[in-house]
């Protein structure tokens, strides 16, 4: 990342992170969503996918909601086995493989992290108290949640509403006519952090968060990293 002065455009720093900071801020966004949308007590978390974000999202979520059990679904058995071995040791919890349906049905929080172009999570799998963060659909062709999932949601949160209506899970739900573009249940993540709207209000609500990625988060984490470096006097 290159950090520029907002007034002059003069480069302030070049951070040779090779995508690391973007990966971290993506996981942080998921954890922030869970802070406001997940139940206060999370016993079981679920993850769909076994890649880098599947790891970082669960690490960040565990800080916010220290769950004791993690259910994992992935297409390749060897990738699932490697993930379970790594994450059970890193988090000190029980990690188990499960079918996608069981991941959703048995978890308090589910994070989907795949580049799937076919819906994985189905409406009938949802249950009271569930929170889902979907972060894999960062183009208009990707989709992890069946559009009908949105019918059962009490709260729907986007990182950027206009962007999610263009591509992401919200985009598909709107195109199928399941979700209105000005749906009263839908608002942005920033409104939660600014406390202008309430998050989860009880343990029965079903909540969804659609994360498509936003540049302002890159700016925020780049500035944070730079300020930390300056305090450490390592640059």
Regions found by a protein language model. Give the residues of each.
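Rossmann-like adenosine-cofactor binding region
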Residues: 92-178
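Adenosine-phosphate binding glycine-rich loop
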Residues: 141-235
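Short helix-loop-beta connector
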Residues: 37-44, 66, 127-128
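Glycine-rich Rossmann-fold phosphate-binding loop(s) that bind the pyrophosphate
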Residues: 49-51
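NAD(P)-binding Rossmann-fold cofactor-contacting core
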Residues: 63-90
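N-terminal Rossmann-fold NAD(P) dinucleotide-binding loop
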Residues: 54-55
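Conserved beta-strand elements of the Class I
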Residues: 45-46, 207
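Phosphate/diphosphate ligand-binding glycine-rich loop within oxidoreductases
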Residues: 1-42
């Amino acid at each position: 990342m290159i950090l520029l002065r907002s007034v002059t455009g003069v480069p302030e720093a070049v951070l040779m992170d090779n995508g690391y900071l973007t990966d971290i801020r993506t996981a942080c966004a998921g954890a922030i969503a869970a802070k406001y949308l997940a139940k206060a007590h999370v016993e079981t978390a679920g993850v769909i996918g076994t890649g880098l974000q599947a790891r970082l999202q669960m690490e960040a979520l565990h800080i916010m909601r220290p769950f004791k059990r993690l259910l994992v679904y992935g297409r390749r058995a060897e990738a699932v086995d490697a993930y379970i071995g790594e994450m059970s040791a890193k988090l000190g919890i029980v990690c188990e493989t499960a079918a996608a349906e069981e991941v959703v049905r048995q978890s308090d929080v589910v994070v989907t992290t795949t580049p799937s172009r076919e819906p994985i999570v189905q409406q009938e799998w949802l249950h009271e108290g569930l929170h889902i963060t979907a972060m894999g659909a960062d183009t208009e062709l990707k989709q992890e949640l069946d559009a009908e999932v949105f019918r059962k949601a009490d709260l729907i949160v986007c990182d950027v509403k206009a962007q999610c209506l263009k591509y992401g899970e919200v985009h598909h739900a709107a195109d199928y006519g399941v979700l209105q573009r000005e749906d009263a249940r839908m608002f942005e993540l920033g409104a939660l952090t600014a406390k202008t709207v309430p998050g989860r209000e009880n343990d029965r609500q079903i909540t969804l968060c659609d994360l498509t990625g936003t540049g302002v988060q890159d700016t925020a984490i780049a500035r944070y990293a730079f300020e930390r470096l300056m305090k450490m006097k390592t640059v």
